[in-house]
Amino acid sequence: MKLKETLNLGKTAFPMRADLPNKEPQWQAAWEQAELYKKRQELNAGKPAFHLHDGPPYANGNIHVGHALNKISKDIIVRSKSMSGFQAPYVPGWDTHGLPIEQVLAKQGIKRKEMDLAEYLEMCRQYALSQVDKQRDDFKRLGVSADWENPYVTLDPQFEADQIRVFGAMAEKGYIYRGAKPVYWSWSSESALAEAEIEYHDIDSTSLYYANKVKDGKGILDTNTYIVVWTTTPFTVTASRGLTVGPDMDYLVVKPAGSDRQYVVAEGLLDSLAGKFGWESFETLASHKGADLEYIVTEHPWDTDVEELVILGDHVTLESGTGIVHTAPGFGEDDYNVGTKYKLEVAVTVDERGLMMENAGPDFHGQFYNKVTPIVIDKLGDLLLAQEVINHSYPFDWRTKKPIIWRAVPQWFASVSDFRQDILDEIEKTTFHPSWGETRLYNMIRDRGDWVISRQRAWGVPLSIFYAEDGTAIMTKEVTDHVADLFQENGSIIWWQKEAKDLLPEGFTHPGSPNGEFTKETDIMDVWFDSGSSWNGVMNARENLSYPADLYLEGSDQYRGWFNSSLITSVAVNGHAPYKAILSQGFVLDGKGEKMSKSKGNIISPNDVAKQYGADILRLWVASVDTDNDVRVSMEILGQVSETYRKIRNTLRFLIANTSDFNPATDTVAYADLGAVDKYMTIVFNQLVATITDAYERYDFMAIYKAVVNFVTVDLSAFYLDFAKDVVYIEAANSLERRRMQTVFYDILVKITKLLTPILPHTTEEIWSYLEYESEAFVQLAEMPVAETFSAQEDILEAWSAFMTLRTQAQKALEEARNAKIIGKSLEAHLTIYASEEVKTLLTALDSDIALLLIVSQLTIADLADAPADAVAFEGIAFMVEHAIGEVCERSRRIDPTTRMRSYNAFVCDHSAKIIEENFPEAVAEGFEESGK
């Protein structure tokens, strides 16, 4: 027998190398085969409910890292709730209607307008479902636990029916109306857009300063006076029907030197405008308040059939332009709102494809709207005073990445103004993480206009509206309920397969259709109405879920998206929010803080990460970042996270190895019988349990990450485990000293494995497979630990905190001795502590082997007054380091005066000799194979 065989060197097959890319799919297959999601739900039956509602990602393409951040975050929350006494099902969903799918088919050469609509819609449906399958596999590869066999998809007939019921309820309350207000119009999509479908980019535009000649000055302005206006959208001059001034603003009539014309501009902008127009000097003829100019009539710059009225508007400012805004009610929200007050014509001169219409005039007809600036300049002639290129923020279609325009076309709207205050009241009842989300959503709802819900596309849920012969829109409860039932049985495809009369209730009549003829709406609903109805189609429809949901968790862009649309529909129908709490997260940027894009080549694919590092590394990254703000990720950052993971894994591997001979049923030592330092570690660990428990409840994953990393690296690796080896390796296998430490090891190992399961499920499942005495087959079926508190806990923590300060001081003294070549390793040291009475009292109170804790072979405690001049001194304490006396024990590696060669061929100290002689009699009898001496 070899001497080292008398040591209790921890043994385990648990590998240091994780090999996550290969092992994770094996664990996922095992979970699926064991039906773990179902079993966890069964375990939680009857417990308090926690229901997170999954905001549906769009079913198109593989997932990106933003999806991963979102789904992993949700999984962490649901897993932690499931293991903490809550019935917490997780039903994933997908958004499956909308333009992107039509665009994919168009790129494949499929022409919607040249084929049967029902056939086209079925192609859209099949493509969407194929993308659901693709993304489902991607999410499962991340280890997300969910009801994958029963997700919700917005194209499902049941969901479509419930969506129609939401629409019908809003219509019944009078919240649905038709209007011709200007809406965001995407010529590239040939459809109206909602605010949530808009993104802004900085672009360069040609702005024009031009003048309208006064036709009827109402006794205030002469007819040789010109009112100067400014536009950044020259094409809209074709539809200009008014000039808006600020009622309380001051306007001057000026006559430039050498000109026979006089011009009206805002007083506050005159100096800057004079420079732009080349007016070296001018004469001020008069001053007027904007309100004085109301109802003055001007000529259109070139259209002799059009007069433009001077009107008043509060939206006019002195920030730019001339203080006078040309007003085209068909091309702007402010223009429309102020124009309708004065009954201005709502002229629209651009068609759905962005081409100028016939009513724009023969010079413009058929031209693309963004290319007509030279024609406008030519038509203005000498009325043009200046032109310049400006850089400004402009709205774009978020899908096609093309600029959009405001365009007044007949659309269906959901009123928000009718119940806006009710929505705002509900926001104030909602909990927000982070708290600033409340103000953000509140302001968005407060300031938003009514919601345009119609779209001029094909792939979506039809607006269930019929028209009588006299044009009356029909959307009564009887009709919408009937359509909902048809959709539930057949899907919304039936809308396109049947005539209007076959979609109406049998025997339906209407006074507006004396001949019994009806037509149906051909527009579809905004896809935000789809997902915005999910509270009804999912949470209110499934028996194992509840409405309102406990939590909605999405990116911060959803304040204007899903959070917004869901809130509007829910309050409209039921008077309350669809959620009790909202958690929003920032965007995922690359390592430099830049937006990810294919063109930059900086996209991080979750699938690539899973192949290179493993999903648990991506999950640990999610826990490591502050998602209240934008977060960064790169392969380098993930490499750093992987290194942290390695430290955690190897620390837990040490605990596994050194509890391999520990049976918790027979070997556990009661807390009261633990050593002082073991009690301290038990208290510290339970504080960690409390911290993690609280952080899970607050959805603060980063706090968990920081606490775990600190505990593993500082409390365990750098302290407890550093000296624990000298006990668990060296003391007799069944000794009290060793079993005490193993008790703490095992307690930490089991509980931290449970605590980390929501974040690192693959790794903790692998650890759990080595814990043979734990009854649950999978750690996911276990319950979270509950933090304990102990007698005199605060006093114990205070004493050990003081010791940690002493330990740091001692390490500095040892380091100086090492640098002075007095010692090599700290075990070569004889450390003398010159202590004040206060420090002596502390060391006595610790009731511990201080030499063991400081990892020195010999320790002496002396009076502070006896400290030599060359001692390493601190307040109330000093240290002297000398080389320890004696020989190195071959077994304990400590220097001990009692170390000598024994009769059984072992060069060991008395303490090791006693352990050998009591526990290895055969080796003593036969002698050890070899000795270094």
From Swiss-Prot:
A GO CC annotation given for this chain: cytosol
Region forming the signal peptide: none
Binding site for L-isoleucyl-5'-AMP: E554
Catalytic activity, reaction form: tRNA(Ile) + L-isoleucine + ATP = L-isoleucyl-tRNA(Ile) + AMP + diphosphate
Location within or outside the cell: Cytoplasm
Gene3D superfamilies, per database record: 1.10.730.20, HUPs, Ile-tRNA synthetase CP2 domain-like
Molecular function terms, GO-annotated: aminoacyl-tRNA deacylase activity; ATP binding; isoleucine-tRNA ligase activity; tRNA binding
Motif 'KMSKS' region: positions: 595-599
Primary location group: cytoplasm
The entry's keywords: Aminoacyl-tRNA synthetase, ATP-binding, Cytoplasm, Ligase, Nucleotide-binding, Protein biosynthesis
Superkingdom to which the source organism belongs: Bacteria
EC number, as in UniProt: 6.1.1.5
Chain location of the short sequence motif 'HIGH' region per the record: 57-67
Alphabetical GO biological process terms: isoleucyl-tRNA aminoacylation
A Pfam cross-reference name: tRNA-synt_1
Function in brief: Catalyzes the attachment of isoleucine to tRNA(Ile). As IleRS can inadvertently accommodate and process structurally similar amino acids such as valine, to avoid such errors it has two additional distinct tRNA(Ile)-dependent editing activities. One activity is designated as 'pretransfer' editing and involves the hydrolysis of activated Val-AMP. The other activity is designated 'posttransfer' editing and involves deacylation of mischarged Val-tRNA(Ile).
Family, per entry: Belongs to the class-I aminoacyl-tRNA synthetase family. IleS type 1 subfamily.
NCBIfam families associated with the record: ileS
Domain notes: IleRS has two distinct active sites: one for aminoacylation and one for editing. The misactivated valine is translocated from the active site to the editing site, which sterically excludes the correctly activated isoleucine. The single editing site contains two valyl binding pockets, one specific for each substrate (Val-AMP or Val-tRNA(Ile)).
Name the record gives this protein: Isoleucine--tRNA ligase
